[in-house]
């Protein structure tokens, strides 16, 4: 498992039903999530998805997609997100995150579909912010600890 990678997208939307836009940088706030995002303050504060998952789907289906198209807040490169156990801690730019959920039930409300495809439920992870800080495209994202919370 790769222990570090980089941030290739910092994405937000004003409304839950809108496509997220890669704004390049943002502030992750403890107990809230990505400042300015429609999902900030929810139980799943921040969502992460690997660009490799997006690229694989594009290659398999012929669609074109970019960071944010699948409703993720942070698009990563070079780190195997779904292999991280719940409770893992990540350093993402200046902020620290804790993995609280791997994937999600695709039948849940607000499961976003882009051109009929929804990969966040099976290949994304959800985190809470445990230390506030800035995050921007090009920042490293590093696994600090992978011990499971009981």
Located regions from the model:
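Metal-cofactor-dependent catalytic cores
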Residues: 1-150
